[in-house]
Amino acid sequence: MQTSKNQDELVKTFKSILKEERFGSQSEIVVALQGEGFSNINQSKVSRMLSKFGAVRTRNAKQQMVYCLPAELGVPTAGSPLKNLVLDVDHNQSMIVVRTSPGAAQLIARLLDSIGKPEGILGTIAGDDTIFISPSNIQQIEDTLETVKSLFNYTD
């Protein structure tokens, strides 16, 4: 008879598999945890863990509904792990668009607003995972784009 791994290992593995953003149902999470050696796991335990850690269902990059954990974020600074939340930076002739991990856009927009006009950012509008940046001067949008990319160490 296989013994169940301890609670700390379960929590660590649970968080790790949710970061993969590929599990759309609680039963898929149960199967994944059982595959990792947690033989005593069941749907009700998974449900309680999802609730305890504040997991939500959201769309992943493939537009599939999946469970994920909210980002554990502190005060925003350019040197903090916020750079890991920026997934894409693009622009057209009048606007820069930043795509982030789900739930991170408003926090990153707050950081961008705080650096403001001196760095070429007139203002931002943020949703859940997308930020629209209006540059101070459209003729210098390339400079503003490079500033945003360098803030988050983003490379194409």
Swiss-Prot record:
Pfam families: Arg_repressor (PF01316), Arg_repressor_C (PF02863). Pathway: Amino-acid biosynthesis; L-arginine biosynthesis [regulation]. It comes from the Bacteria. One of its GO terms (molecular function) is DNA binding. HAMAP family: Arg_repressor (MF_00173). It comes from Shewanella piezotolerans (strain WP3 / JCM 13877). Belongs to the ArgR family. It is found in: Cytoplasm. InterPro entries: Arg_repress, Arg_repress_C, Arg_repress_C_sf, Arg_repress_DNA-bd, WH-like_DNA-bd_sf, WH_DNA-bd_sf. One of its GO terms (cellular component) is cytoplasm. This is Arginine repressor. Regulates arginine biosynthesis genes. GO terms for biological process: L-arginine biosynthetic process; protein complex oligomerization; regulation of arginine biosynthetic process. Keywords: Amino-acid biosynthesis, Arginine biosynthesis, Cytoplasm, DNA-binding, Repressor, Transcription, Transcription regulation.
